[in-house]
Regions:
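Residues at alpha-helix boundaries and short interhelical turns
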Residues: 79, 96, 201-204
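Phosphate-binding/switch region of NTP-binding enzymes
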Residues: 65, 82-169
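A broad detector of the eukaryotic-type serine/threonine protein kinase catalytic domain
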Residues: 72-76, 104-107, 198
């Protein structure tokens, strides 16, 4: 993993909310809580309005990675329109650096991004995120669903823990730690049982454990 100057374009939430979240993430990762990150906080504005400002920030701060939260705030038209999808992808490509754009899924189908197929056609790497809540923690699964010029890595799982102040810890996890993640990924019951058993010590599990 290479560290690089990063810009996060926040179109969804208040700047104060993101400063609080950054403090919590830094603390959970064992970093200096005051560690800075460059943001453009523009809740209520659109990617179309901020294009020039983003490009200027990329040049001024030698940014190498840009995050956009999210494409639903692009302000370039209906997301189901092919021309809108192409315009958004073109705008991001014009930044001349690596970019990550957060997309949302339709209510009826969590396997792809809401909108035109050209969103997925225009991405080099597509990552699907799934989650499962449990008392005091949140299980996260990340799966690379598209990879143009790299080998697809294995699925990654993380456990986020929380206290009264918010996020307090981040650690790696196993898919068997969060059974509902297996349901989302593998609806076939037989395959889920197989994965669960193989994830146990000595690859053994009782009937009650499986149930």
């Amino acid at each position: 993993v290479n560290k690089a100057p990063t810009l996060f374009v926040n179109l969804e939430r208040s700047g104060l909310s993101f400063q609080r979240r950054l403090w919590q993430v830094n603390t959970a990762l064992g970093l200096d809580p005051q560690r800075k990150m460059l943001f453009i906080n523009a809740r209520g504005h659109t990617l179309a309005e901020l294009g020039n400002s983003i490009r200027e920030s990329v040049l001024r701060h030698s940014i190498q990675v840009v995050f956009i939260d999210s494409i639903s705030r692009a302000g370039m038209g209906s997301l189901v329109d092919d021309r809108t999808a192409n315009s958004i992808v073109d705008t991001l490509n014009q930044l001349g650096v690596a970019w990550y754009a957060i997309g949302h899924t339709p209510r009826a189908d969590a396997t792809h991004i809401y909108g035109a197929v050209h969103f997925e056609a225009g991405e080099d790497i597509g990552i699907r995120m799934i989650s499962q809540e449990s008392p005091g923690s949140l299980g996260i699964g990340l799966e690379v669903v598209k990879a143009n010029d790299i080998a697809k890595p294995k699925k990654a799982y993380y456990r986020l823990t929380f206290d009264n102040a918010g996020l307090s810890g981040i650690e790696t996890a196993k898919e068997t730690d969060f059974p509902d993640l297996m349901v989302q990924e593998q609806p076939d019951v037989t395959e889920r049982i197989k994965v669960y058993i193989l994830g146990q010590p000595k690859a053994e599990a009782s009937v009650s454990d499986i149930a």
